[in-house]
């Protein structure tokens, strides 16, 4: 014998209005769950963006300037120069005067700190290593901060990935489309490595 409850339930399910109510409640539950999930996704994405933007760039070296000759410390440097090298402390030296720890030997007279030799007032230099060394001057921090604020969207993939001043100066001083006037012509064929806010002036056609 079929229980009375089961019989009543079957009779209710046969009525269209009951099916409509069940369908409506299911639809409301589905939409509510979907919206809540979307809200959580948006909230998490916004939180991640805030955390990324709030992480400041490291403007100071991790150890004090002047101790580059101590082997206990390691320096990153500009690597690529055949004749000159700039380390992360701002010293520029001849490649032969580079220590095994990657730092310039500060005891060599030709080693210079924050040297702007070959650089013009607009922040463009004819030698990449001098561009990096000059860019690392503490007085250039505000200039670099202004550039980052303006370039955050246009160069987000490139400049928002840097973690400190040295990485920023390495990236900023590399020749880019800003230094090019035409496909194979630099705006300034001599001073083409720029850390400044603005590209070199266009050459007269």
Curated annotation (Swiss-Prot):
Topology class, membrane: Single-pass membrane protein
Highest taxon of source: Eukaryota
Subcellular location(s) per record: Golgi apparatus membrane
Main subcellular location of this protein, as a coarse class: Golgi
Keywords: Glycoprotein, Golgi apparatus, Membrane, Transmembrane, Transmembrane helix
Membrane-side (Lumenal) residue stretches: 36-205
InterPro entries: SPRING1 (IPR019352)
Cytoplasmic membrane side: 1-16
Transmembrane annotation, as ranges: 17-35
Glycosylation sites: 67
Record GO cellular component, one term: Golgi membrane
Swiss-Prot/TrEMBL GO biological process terms: positive regulation of SREBP signaling pathway
Summary of the function given for this chain in its UniProt record: Positively regulates hepatic SREBP signaling pathway by modulating the proper localization of SCAP (SREBP cleavage-activating protein) to the endoplasmic reticulum, thereby controlling the level of functional SCAP.
PANTHER family, A to Z: SREBP REGULATING GENE PROTEIN
Homology family: Belongs to the SPRING family.
Protein name: SREBP regulating gene protein
Taxonomic source organism: Gallus gallus (Chicken)
Source species taxonomy: Eukaryota, Metazoa, Chordata, Craniata, Vertebrata
